[in-house]
A protein has these predicted regions:
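Flexible active-site lid/hinge loop adjacent to a nucleotide/diphosphate
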Residues: 86, 90-102
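A short alpha->loop->secondary-structure connector
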Residues: 65-71, 96-98, 123-132
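Charged, alpha-helix-enriched surfaces in structured cytosolic catalytic cores
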Residues: 25-28, 53, 57, 71, ...
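Hydrophobic packing residues within well-ordered alpha-helices of enzyme cores
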Residues: 3-4, 58, 122, 126, ...
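Short, conserved catalytic or adaptor-binding loops enriched in Gly and charged residues
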Residues: 4-9, 99, 133-137
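Short, well-ordered beta-strand elements
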Residues: 245-251
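C-terminal accessory "lid"/substrate-recognition subdomains
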Residues: 102-108, 113-242, 253-256, 264-265
Length: 265
């Protein structure tokens, strides 16, 4: 929400659906939000998930009454790390496949930082994940192999008209208690430098679980906001105009107590 504040105005509003709940509760909140927005007369709605997302929720809810009469699905765009890690679990590969199978276009984030070999390995990984869930689709022309800043008007027009693909694949029931999670840590009393150091340590500690990403905001010694973004490849801390005292940890089989020790001690 904070990163999208510049878009707000008379013709654009931002709404948020709270996470940290079970699957059915989140689906109900999503449906309720779409009904409320439909009654407000919006003519375009962009759904931007954060963290681990069940794609079936999106399609299932939009086929419920009365939403099936109010909304029409336009484009499904999937953003994939151009330097995608190779050693993902079966469950993680399933999520990767499910979030790519229906996409009309796929954008490789941080493509400018990746080598040609890394990009090709990522594309091979995507198609291998699709094959593992018995999906017949193979991705190639749908993939934007360039940095977001390099996208041309022609590229954006292609994305705008890319639509989506109603693809079939084998579903996997993910155990909510043992699977993927997003943990939120509010108002941490930690400096920007110390946060960066502690995040690097906990991402290497198997006792914390498998951490995919850590993101959030913290103030530096001068009282200015800094934005943290950490993956298995790198950890960055960059200035940002506004922020909120929150750190979000995304991963698989996360151990909150262990992670909290790094962030609070």
């Amino acid at each position: 929400m904070l990163l999208l504040q510049d878009l707000m105005g008379d013709n654009c509003e931002l709404e948020m659906i709270s996470g940290g709940c079970d699957k059915e509760t989140h689906r109900r909140r999503f449906r309720t939000k779409l009904i409320a927005m439909g009654m407000c007369g919006y003519d375009r709605v962009i759904v931007e998930p954060s963290g681990i997302y069940d794609v079936d929720e999106f399609f299932d809810v939009l086929h419920d009454e009365p939403l099936d009469k109010w909304y029409e699905i336009g484009n499904v765009v999937t953003i994939v790390d151009a330097k995608l890690e190779s050693g993902l679990s079966e469950e993680a590969d399933y999520l990767l496949a499910s979030e790519a199978a229906n996409a009309g276009s796929i954008i490789l984030s941080r493509a400018e930082e990746a080598t040609k070999e890394q990009i090709e390995n990522t594309i091979e990984h995507l198609n291998r994940a699709l094959e593992q869930v018995q999906c017949k689709r193979r991705l190639d022309r749908e993939i934007m192999r360039k940095d977001g800043a390099e996208l041309s008007e022609e590229d954006f027009d292609k994305i705008l008209k890319s639509g989506y693909v109603a693809e079939n694949y084998r579903k996997m029931e993910l155990d909510e208690k043992k699977g993927f999670d997003s943990l939120y840590f509010m108002e941490l009393k930690i400096s920007a430098d110390e946060l960066k150091t502690q995040v690097a340590k906990m991402m290497q500690d198997p006792e914390c679980g498998v951490i995919f990403r850590v993101k959030g905001f913290v103030k530096d010694d001068a009282g200015s906001w800094m934005q943290l973004n950490a993956t298995g490849h790198e950890i960055s801390m960059k200035p940002i105009g506004d922020g909120q005292e929150v750190v979000i940890v995304i991963g698989e089989q996360l151990k909150e107590d262990c992670i909290r020790k790094y962030l609070e001690n």
